Amino acid sequence: RQMCIRDRPVIAQKTGADAASVVYDAYQSAIAKDIDILIADTAGRLHTQDNLMQELEKIKRVLKKHNENAPHETLLVIDGGSGQNAIQQANEFHKSINLSGLAVTKLDGTAKGGVLFAISDSLNLPIRFIGIGEAIDDLKPFNARDFVDALFD
């Protein structure tokens, strides 16, 4: 099933559909339409849910069968208020699917997201994006100076 959000095509299936199949369908659609960026949102997974972590591994295997370089980015999105639990979460996701970077959300409230430094350092991962609200335009490229300044405000 395809719909559009802000004039961007979105591929979706019914709840409970095989995640790897949905991503494969989206990949095939992107290729057919000469779209060069595909974002697969696999939100809602906890590192303690083995079956959902195995789904992520399957998604990666399916994509690699069709493009040995895929996925080109594998970002872990961390809730800015999650605290030290995010370290274990990042370790498990990295071990499972080899992350390429980090993003942090919910920095529009009291959360500071300071745990990102520990994760970035221990896993040698760049911080790519920060989320400062719920609108699509509230996802911003990470700027280290601005982030550090905000930590001390």
Question: Language-model features: where?
Answer:
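Short glycine-rich anion-binding loops that position phosphate/pyrophosphate groups of nucleotides
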Residues: 43-45
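Short, small-residue-biased leader/transition segments that mark boundaries at the very start
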Residues: 1-5
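Walker B beta-strand of ABC/ABC-like P-loop ATPase nucleotide-binding domains
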Residues: 38-40, 103
